[in-house]
């Protein structure tokens, strides 16, 4: 995928870039693999805002992605199309299995229409194949990695991300995550070979506020622009400082406070925290 630039015939067009969508081979999604995606506006079932700055945006259909692939072990599938998915930064690939079923998976970099992919312990460690980590060679690059066997992929699902297999010990495989963290993952967890495609996504510049609204993002209001009743930074005549350590609307320090629970059960699996600590 390449990034498309524009002539600056308006101020917002000067910096704006978009994806050129040249790698896509199908425009309409597979109807049987889509479900409605109702808007919440950031509200819960009581109508109260639980996630601020969410609302509006273009209507979307959710594409059902197969993040497990376990039940299709040793059933080959041909890549029928590479498609756009508005719900994620990565592209998705439509698979046609030899038993007649169709499914979506995340499209790794380099996957093309007509290629055959497979899954299961007997699958070869090649691009697009999903297999348990114990069968993935050390040094290989993977994505869509499970944290718990059978739960489905949770790690490295965004465009351009990947995880490297660093080593193996007993029932665990040591992985280097995109954050730099070294972590043990159970060897029965599935992973897909390759890097997630559409790596140029990070270079896209929205260019104008309205384009952010199309994505369902509302303006992020500063606390210092509010009244004291609304935020700890609010109030004062003219522009005034917070007068305290910067905090969230609920008083929690906002700059560098550690929020991870102490003695969390998964700490035993983390060898090196992100940032090399």
Curated annotation (Swiss-Prot):
Looking at the Swiss-Prot or TrEMBL record, what is one Pfam family this protein matches? Answer: Ribosomal_L2
Q: Tell me, what is an example of a GO biological process annotation in this record?
A: cytoplasmic translation
> What quaternary arrangement does the UniProt entry report?
Part of the 50S ribosomal subunit. Forms a bridge to the 30S subunit in the 70S ribosome.
List, alphabetically, the PROSITE patterns matched.
RIBOSOMAL_L2
Q: Where is this region: Disordered?
A: 215-263
Known NCBIfam families for this protein? rplB_bact
Q: What does this protein do?
A: One of the primary rRNA binding proteins. Required for association of the 30S and 50S subunits to form the 70S ribosome, for tRNA binding and peptide bond formation. It has been suggested to have peptidyltransferase activity; this is somewhat controversial. Makes several contacts with the 16S rRNA in the 70S ribosome.
HAMAP family in the cross-refs? Ribosomal_uL2_B
Q: Which domain of life is it from?
A: Bacteria
Q: Which PANTHER family match?
A: LARGE RIBOSOMAL SUBUNIT PROTEIN UL2M (PTHR13691:SF5), RIBOSOMAL PROTEIN L2 (PTHR13691)
Query: In which family does this protein belong, per the annotation?
Result: Belongs to the universal ribosomal protein uL2 family.
Instruction: Name the UniProt key words of this record, in alphabetical order.
Output: Ribonucleoprotein, Ribosomal protein, RNA-binding, rRNA-binding
Which GO MF terms does the UniProt record name?
Answer: rRNA binding; structural constituent of ribosome; transferase activity
Disulfide bond sites: none
Q: What is this protein called?
A: Large ribosomal subunit protein uL2
* Gene Ontology CC annotations of this record: large ribosomal subunit
């Amino acid at each position: 995928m390449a990034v498309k630039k524009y002539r600056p015939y308006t101020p917002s067009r000067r910096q704006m870039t978009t994806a050129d969508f040249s790698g896509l081979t199908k425009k309409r999604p597979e109807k049987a693999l889509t479900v409605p995606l109702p808007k919440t506006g950031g509200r819960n079932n009581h109508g109260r805002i639980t996630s601020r700055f969410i609302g509006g945006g273009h209507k979307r259909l959710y594409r059902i992605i197969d993040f497990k692939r376990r039940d299709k072990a040793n059933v080959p599938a041909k890549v029928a199309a590479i498609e756009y998915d508005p719900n994620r930064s990565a592209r998705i690939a439509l698979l046609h299995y030899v038993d007649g079923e169709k499914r979506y998976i995340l499209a790794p970099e380099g996957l093309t229409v007509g290629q055959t992919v497979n899954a299961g312990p007997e699958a070869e460690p090649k691009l697009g194949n999903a297999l348990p980590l114990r069968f993935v060679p050390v040094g290989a690059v993977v994505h869509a990695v499970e944290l718990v066997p059978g739960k489905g992929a949770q790690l490295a699902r965004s465009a351009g991300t990947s995880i490297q297999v660093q080593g193996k010990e007993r029932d665990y495989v040591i992985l280097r995550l995109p954050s730099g963290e070294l972590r043990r993952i159970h060897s029965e967890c599935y992973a897909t070979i390759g890097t997630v495609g559409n790596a140029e996504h990070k270079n896209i510049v929205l260019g104008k506020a309205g384009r952010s609204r199309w994505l369902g993002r509302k303006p992020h209001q500063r606390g210092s622009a509010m009244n004291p009743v609304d935020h700890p930074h609010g109030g004062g005549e003219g522009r005034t400082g917070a007068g305290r350590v910067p905090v969230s609307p609920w008083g929690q320090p906002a700059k560098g406070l550690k929020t991870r629970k102490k003695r969390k059960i998964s700490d035993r699996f983390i060898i090196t925290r992100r940032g090399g600590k």
